[in-house]
Amino acid sequence: MESSKKMDSPGALQTNPPLKLHTDRSAGTPVFVPEQGGYKEKFVKTVEDKYKCEKCHLVLCSPKQTECGHRFCESCMAALLSSSSPKCTACQESIVKDKVFKDNCCKREILALQIYCRNESRGCAEQLMLGHLLVHLKNDCHFEELPCVRPDCKEKVLRKDLRDHVEKACKYREATCSHCKSQVPMIALQKHEDTDCPCVVVSCPHKCSVQTLLRSELSAHLSECVNAPSTCSFKRYGCVFQGTNQQIKAHEASSAVQHVNLLKEWSNSLEKKVSLLQNESVEKNKSIQSLHNQICSFEIEIERQKEMLRNNESKILHLQRVIDSQAEKLKELDKEIRPFRQNWEEADSMKSSVESLQNRVTELESVDKSAGQVARNTGLLESQLSRHDQMLSVHDIRLADMDLRFQVLETASYNGVLIWKIRDYKRRKQEAVMGKTLSLYSQPFYTGYFGYKMCARVYLNGDGMGKGTHLSLFFVIMRGEYDALLPWPFKQKVTLMLMDQGSSRRHLGDAFKPDPNSSSFKKPTGEMNIASGCPVFVAQTVLENGTYIKDDTIFIKVIVDTSDLPDP
């Protein structure tokens, strides 16, 4: 960028920026405002630095002053404030938007600076205040380019030349036709005389005896000109004769036999076309009949689809009733759990009583041995403590059983999809390595409320071929309440998946179709069948070095395809 002093020198050539009209409210005078940055006008005297923007280094336009005392153009300040942490380009102080204000005093001083007219290069020698530039260009400058006042003319001329252009040089000025005396734009005068003027003298194009006539009379003359070419009235039937009106009459009188033959040929051709149309009509009728048959077939299919829709609606209603029934069961379970909660509270109370009794026993044991009655009381208290301990044990067992049942109900799914969350991966993996707990079973899941009962089984340290190197994942069919109503062997497609907990979601998965001859997919005779799946599902190095483990937790997903599964 050139320095501001070079740009402000009186002899420097400058390119003025695009301008928009803006009203100075403080002075009531219209002034020019650049679209961006400060003024690039040619000033008569070198402009002081205090009148220049600290960002664009041009003469300030609508100056704004910051808290640190530096000035910026309004558009430059807006650009600075659009950043996340605006700073003054002069002193690097932070700029606070609410503490930036308009510097109207500086603005008035700048608008009073003397400049050369923008049209100096065209010959204008005017020197004026910057604030008067717009009025000068709009009303007074003889060297300002203005558009021609005629709407169709696109030329621009200097204000001093505008009158001569409009009256003498504009191609769209009015001109008078020398033949018809009508007013025509100068640019269209020649075309008017050559093709349109009705008063221009023309000759007959057929070289008849009439040599001169007006263009307005030509149309009527051509309709009766003896030399005008014409065609035989039997042209549509194949006659190609052409000539003057007199020749046409003589031809028609002498060629009657030829014309009759042409009529015969035309009639024969017409009969052939009628025959073809009849054949086409027969084919069309066949097509129409075929389309009618298709429509009937479609109507039958639509009725069948409607019946299927009604059946599906009844199934949906049945499922809704089942869901309502399950909701009622959950409510009943909640009611059953409430007494156990009360028992738990009673157990807490009993524990407090036991602690109190133990304290009393301790006190009694420290009393003099001669107190025989105390010994008997101690025995009685010990028996009471024993009964309380038994009751607490029973309550603990019943609460644990209810908690297990409730957890199974909470985590069970009935859409053929299992998402199994395995916490404490490192501890469980170490237990598998040490041989304490080789495998883990997931909670059961189902293909429907009355469908197959299934679960997943995982070996964190691998099994068989994958032992010590891989995670082994298997699918297990369990004995369900509704197995008697389901088709066997189990045939649904199974997808096993290890879920990626990172943002890329690059899950690892494998899918298989059950082998109908395998005992793993027969109807269970025990609690569950033999597991079937992938001994080398994923290498432990891949599992433990990726984003498959977060917060010492992994997620395993099993999907059973239920799309073709019939209702029981």
Curated annotation (Swiss-Prot):
SMART domains: MATH (SM00061). Undergoes 'Lys-48'-linked polyubiquitination, leading to its proteasomal degradation in response to signaling by TNFSF13B, TLR4 or through CD40. 'Lys-48'-linked polyubiquitinated form is deubiquitinated by OTUD7B, preventing TRAF3 proteolysis and over-activation of non-canonical NF-kappa-B. Undergoes 'Lys-63'-linked ubiquitination during early stages of virus infection, and 'Lys-48'-linked ubiquitination during later stages. Undergoes both 'Lys-48'-linked and 'Lys-63'-linked ubiquitination in response to TLR3 and TLR4 signaling. 'Lys-63'-linked ubiquitination can be mediated by TRIM35. (Microbial infection) Cleaved by enterovirus D68 protease 2A; leading to inhibition of NF-kappa-B or IFN-beta triggered by TRAF3. Residues 392-415 are annotated as: (Microbial infection) Interaction with glycoprotein N of Andes and New York hantaviruses. One of its GO terms (biological process) is TRIF-dependent toll-like receptor signaling pathway. CDD domains: MATH_TRAF3, RING-HC_TRAF3. GO terms for cellular component: CD40 receptor complex; cytoplasm; cytoplasmic side of plasma membrane; cytosol; endosome; endosome membrane; mitochondrion; serine/threonine protein kinase complex. It is found in: Cytoplasm; Endosome; Mitochondrion. A zinc finger (TRAF-type) spans 135-190, 191-249. It comes from the Eukaryota. Changing F512E: Abolishes interaction with LTBR, CD40 and TANK. Changing G462A: Confers resistance to cleavage by enterovirus D68 protease 2A. It catalyses: S-ubiquitinyl-[E2 ubiquitin-conjugating enzyme]-L-cysteine + [acceptor protein]-L-lysine = [E2 ubiquitin-conjugating enzyme]-L-cysteine + N(6)-ubiquitinyl-[acceptor protein]-L-lysine. It is linked to Immunodeficiency 132A: An autosomal dominant immunologic disorder characterized by increased susceptibility to infection with certain pathogens, including Herpes simplex virus and Mycobacterium abscessus. Immunologic work-up shows impaired production of cytokines, including INFB and IL6. Immunodeficiency 132B: An autosomal dominant immune disorder characterized by childhood onset of recurrent upper and lower respiratory infections, B-cell lymphoid hyperplasia, and dysregulation of T-cell subsets and function. Additional variable features include autoimmunity, autoinflammation, and hyper- or hypogammaglobulinemia. This is TNF receptor-associated factor 3.
